Design a protein with these regions (language model features):
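Short, polar/acidic, helix-capping and beta-turn segments at strand->helix junctions
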Residues: 2-128
Length: 128
């Protein structure tokens, strides 16, 4: 049985989907774009966008009672792979600051993302 996850600490879904689903032992987030849930704003800086997307993922994971250290897989969608080093630095800082091991990850370049942002991140977390 699955349960929809909803939190005001991450942006509301902008389409017919939920922020995440709780499957009991597994949490799957929808892709989180770097919209600040309090202001609705988006930074132009790709490092700041990476950080905000990860904070939004974390908010969905925490709404299910888990934490960043429970994330076991992420998929990162970027508009420009030339930003790879900048994304990696922000990504590394986020997991280090949250005392979380680095999860498995895929990173793919895409033509376009919702709201023309530069990055979107989705995650899978496990309840242990």
């Amino acid at each position: 049985m699955s349960r929809a996850i909803s939190t005001e600490n991450a942006p509301a879904a902008i389409g017919p989907y939920v922020q995440g689903v709780d499957l009991g032992s597994m949490i799957i987030t929808s892709g989180q774009i770097p919209v600040d849930p309090k202001t609705g704003g988006v930074s132009e800086d790709v490092a700041a966008q990476t950080r905000q997307s990860l904070e939004n993922v974390k908010a969905v994971v925490e709404a299910s009672g888990l934490k960043a250290s429970d994330i076991v897989k992420t998929t990162v969608f970027v508009k420009d792979l030339n930003d790879f080093a900048i994304v990696n630095a922000a990504y590394e800082a986020f997991f280090t600051e949250n005392d979380a091991p680095f999860p498995a990850r895929s990173c793919v370049e895409v033509a376009r993302l919702p709201k023309d942002v530069k990055i979107e991140i989705e995650a899978i977390a496990l309840r242990r």
